[in-house]
Amino acid sequence: MTTHHSAETASTPHPHGFATKPRAMTSERTRIKICGLTREQDVDAAVAAGADAVGFVLYAPSPRAVTPERAAQLARRLPPFVTPVLLFVNESATNIAAASAMVAGAIVQFHGDETPADCLLATGHGLRPFLRA
């Protein structure tokens, strides 16, 4: 009798000790974010190249910085399935909430010394999706 092992039944190990979906049955896809865009033609090129997300830097000291108003203007060029990402560095929760309200569907990315509590406060306790870099 021959025993056959199939990749369809092999579980992928999980770092917390339990198995995830079988390897052959999952489809992995890398999402691409292009960040630091400041011009319409760059946003259009990122979308044409297949970017899944486009980032706008709202940190004034950065050479790639844009204002919240400019980020909103550029984000309006994005098609429905390209996600706008607003990048902040040590910004106040009030300013993050105000800027986020200007860009429909935006995800917030924290790139400073923000604590988990700071991230939750600035995103309405997680009502707006966020990333911590």
Predicted features by range, described:
Residues 1-2, 11-13:
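Intrinsic low-complexity/disordered segments
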Residues 2, 21-133:
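Conserved N-terminal beta1-alpha1 strand-loop-helix module at the mouth
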Residues 5-6, 15-19:
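Short hydrophobic alpha-helical segments enriched in small aliphatic residues
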Residues 13-16, 24:
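Short, linear, compositionally biased motifs with a strong N-terminal bias
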